[in-house]
């Protein structure tokens, strides 16, 4: 028999085996099944729509109720099953998909029209690109010369509160959370809106951009709403950093932070209401961070 005939025969046998449904091998093997579900490749299931907390993959768990309860306590990848020593295909694909979302969020940028849409003065750190922002955090804490001049000419000085929105390490956060968060926070400070300074948006900005802006505008307090480093499945997490008397040389321990603001953590509207209460406490005490008792 010619070599090509042997190869064709082997391929045909393999394809036949793949079309069969076999039982799991003894010793914890996995089922080798390829079922025809009528999917022609044009309607592939979106893995992102699967709720991992309710997706039970372990066959015949010893304590099913405890397994279900454990899964509901966290969105982390616990209680997944395996094929030999490898993860199942859907588990691996979901991991890759969530990792891609996190990468896109870090490397993405907020649309140029966003600041103007919400009447924010758009400023930029000394970073010239996203790559420089990721590798030079020191430059992300300082404003470039053009932004300094813009702040001096366009922003109100000596306000009670300066609101700063920053893209941070997750560009998805700004559009998904910021409008609801700011609206709730201002609603909590109803009747006191005129004590807020000109809101600003910082591109390629770190938390300490608060210090550079505070040094120029001299507000009593400042709040930075910033996109945090995304995790797997949590690419929209925001934190709010509040500093009393923001200025150059301010140390990290002087900032008060509220983190994990996203739909799977503290919802934006709820966080906004909490921040309004917290801001009042900080302004009354004239202190923030470890100095707030």
Where do the model's predicted regions map?
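Protein-protein interaction and targeting regions used for scaffolding, dimerization, and localization
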Residues: 1-45
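Conserved active-site and cofactor/substrate-binding residues in soluble primary-metabolism enzymes
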Residues: 2-9, 105, 118, 138, ...
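Active-site loop/lid in soluble adenylation, ligation, and acyl-transfer enzymes
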Residues: 31-138
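Conserved mixed alpha/beta catalytic, RNA-binding, or beta-rich assembly cores of soluble enzyme
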Residues: 135-164, 168-221, 233, 239-242, ...
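Flexible, glycine/charged-enriched surface loops at secondary-structure junctions
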Residues: 23-25, 192-198, 284-293
């Amino acid at each position: 028999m010619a070599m090509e005939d042997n190869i064709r025969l082997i391929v045909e046998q393999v394809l036949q085996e793949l079309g069969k449904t076999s039982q799991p091998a003894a010793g914890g093997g996995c089922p080798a099944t390829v079922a025809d579900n009528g999917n022609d490749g044009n309607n592939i299931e979106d893995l992102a729509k699967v709720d991992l907390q309710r997706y039970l993959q372990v066959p015949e768990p010893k304590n099913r109720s405890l397994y279900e309860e454990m899964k509901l306590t966290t969105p982390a990848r616990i209680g997944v099953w395996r094929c030999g020593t490898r993860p199942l295909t859907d588990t691996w694909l979901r991991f890759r998909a969530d990792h891609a979302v996190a990468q896109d969020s870090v490397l993405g940028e907020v649309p140029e029209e966003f600041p103007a849409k919400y009447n924010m003065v758009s400023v930029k750190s000394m970073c010239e690109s996203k790559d420089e922002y990721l590798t030079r955090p020191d430059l992300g804490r300082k404003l470039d010369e053009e932004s300094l001049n813009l702040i001096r000419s366009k922003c109100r000085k000596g306000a009670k509160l300066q609101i700063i929105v920053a893209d941070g390490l997750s560009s998805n956060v700004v559009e998904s959370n910021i409008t609801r968060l700011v609206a709730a926070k201002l609603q909590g400070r109803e009747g006191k809106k005129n004590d807020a300074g000109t809101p600003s948006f910082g591109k390629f900005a770190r938390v300490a951009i608060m210090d550079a802006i505070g040094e120029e505008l001299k507000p009593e307090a400042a709040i930075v709403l910033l996109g945090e480093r995304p995790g797997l499945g949590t690419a929209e997490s925001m934190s709010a950093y509040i500093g009393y008397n923001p200025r150059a040389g301010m140390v990290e321990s002087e900032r008060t932070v509220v983190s994990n603001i996203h739909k799977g953590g503290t919802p934006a509207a709820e966080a906004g209401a909490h921040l309004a209460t917290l801001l009042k406490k900080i302004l009354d005490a004239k202190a923030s961070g470890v100095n707030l008792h």
